[in-house]
Every structure is written in structure tokens, then in C-alpha cells.
Amino acid sequence: MVAKAKEKVKAENVRFDMADLTKRWNCEDGAYDFIICNLVLEHIKDLYDIFSEAARTLRQGDKFFINELHPFKQYQGTKARFERNSATIEVDAFTHHISDFTNTASASGFKLIKINEYWHAEDQNKPPRLVSFLFEKA
């Protein structure tokens, strides 16, 4: 996914890093001005360390964007999966409620700027597929 992102974004002021998010991030305090986590936090049991590191590596007013499988889909049994050699592989996932994101963000020094829910066009009357949060470091 990092390689695909690098293909799409050529700006010199954008840096893509790949690391184990559950460990201390290999960067200085205030090193970033915008952090994106896309469909990754459902695979991490405890959100606090992630938010804590995001707070450490952002400056006041900087943003933290999260996009995840909506917990409503998880309540229905939907899991992350991918295809490999014609086999479907299900990936371990943890259900994080909306309040888990907002409360952990608040405890880590973030304020919620925006929350959005997303559906496929044909699923407008069903639970949302994705949820995104935009937080700002207070």
C-alpha cells in the first residue's frame, strides 16, 4: 500500500513511513503536521498508544485523520479479508466503538473536528461501511 501511495502522491513535502504502530515511532517530537491511519486501527487492540504517539509527533493545531471499518459492520460480523492464491484470508480485528476513538483522542489531547460515515451507493438504508474522524491536536 505504501508503494501505491507513493505512486499517486509525488509532492516533495509528503513523506510515507511504514512502521510497527504499537511501538514508539522512530521520529522526533513534532515531526509531522498530518497523520493518516487508513483501515489499520481495527487490527490494533489498544488505541491509547497510537493516539499518544500521534500526539507526541504532531504540533498544536496539526491534524490526525483516521478512516476505519465502521463498528456497525463489525457488529454484523464483517471482517477485514484479502485474497491470496485464490484463498480468502481473514485478518484478526478488534471492534472499537465510536466512543473508543473519541474518548481516547480526548484523553490524548485531541479535539474532534469532523466525523463522517460512508456507504456504498446501493447500501444507503443499511449500516455504514466506513467511518472517518478528523482530530486536531489541542
Where are these regions (language model features)?
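Conserved class I S-adenosyl-L-methionine
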Residues: F65-T95
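A short acidic, Gly/Pro-enriched loop at the edge of an enzyme's catalytic core
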Residues: W25-I35
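Short alpha-helix
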Residues: A93-I115
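A short glycine-rich, Lys/Arg-flanked "PGG" loop and its adjoining helix->strand segment in the class I
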Residues: Y48-K63
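Conserved SAM-binding strand-loop segment of SAM-dependent methyltransferases
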Residues: K10-N26
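A short SAM/SAH-binding and catalytic strip from SAM-dependent methyltransferases
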Residues: D33-L47
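Conserved SAM-binding loop
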Residues: A5-K6
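Core SAM-dependent methyltransferase catalytic element
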Residues: E122-A138
